[in-house]
Amino acid sequence: MPEHAAPSYPFVYLASQSPRRRELLDQLGVRYELLAPAPDEDAEALEAELPGEAPDHYVLRVCVAKAQAARARLVARGLPAAPVLVADTTVTIDGAILGKPADAADALAMLARLAGRTHDVLTALAVIDATGELMPPALSRSAVRFAPAAREALARYVETGEPFGKAGAYAIQGRAAEFVERIDGSHSGIMGLPLFETAALLRAAHVAF
């Protein structure tokens, strides 16, 4: 046995306001504390695309930037040391990045672009360990096939309000499931937190669960 075993941590800081990610951590049995941005933090600014940026690079870069911002938040607030977990999800088709829709028209345009086609859902994961070191980030890639859908059906979905705040303007675990013909990859990754990769990273960061 090593003389000095690494300490384990009974919880992780989750730097996300997504209810879906909280539910998925609950599914793993991971205890967490929310590490939300302060009102004066411009978290959305971190999601700005760079010119010509590839989707893989984009989602990993944004995820790491959010993790670093969360770690700085932890230190500034004088919180107890523990690992920080951040995830970021984007939808991509034809090399384009489909983030969160700006309004109903934007949501409808995104959904119309996805209808009858296959797109990729990328979710990046970043963990900063309790000492402040960034661990190698992970990337989950899944392919989602949408069935052809009439514009009226898509418009009705937009009217539910579900597309807002979601990459690609849909939630696979919600009413958008009626459009999903098949998936190839991680269902939890499409929801926003791939559990296989999450469990591996948290165990490597000595989170007990």
UniProtKB/Swiss-Prot annotation:
SUPFAM superfamilies: ITPase-like. Keywords: Cytoplasm, Hydrolase, Nucleotide metabolism. GO terms for cellular component: cytoplasm. Its cofactor is a divalent metal cation. One of its GO terms (molecular function) is UTP diphosphatase activity. Pfam families: Maf. It is found in: Cytoplasm. It comes from the Bacteria. It catalyses: dTTP + H2O = dTMP + diphosphate + H(+); UTP + H2O = UMP + diphosphate + H(+). One of its GO terms (biological process) is nucleotide metabolic process. The record marks 20, 89, 173 as: Important for substrate specificity. Its EC number is 3.6.1.9. The active site is at residue 88. Nucleoside triphosphate pyrophosphatase that hydrolyzes dTTP and UTP. May have a dual role in cell division arrest and in preventing the incorporation of modified nucleotides into cellular nucleic acids. Belongs to the Maf family. YhdE subfamily. PANTHER family: BIFUNCTIONAL DTTP/UTP PYROPHOSPHATASE/METHYLTRANSFERASE PROTEIN-RELATED, BIFUNCTIONAL DTTP_UTP PYROPHOSPHATASE_METHYLTRANSFERASE PROTEIN-RELATED. This is dTTP/UTP pyrophosphatase.
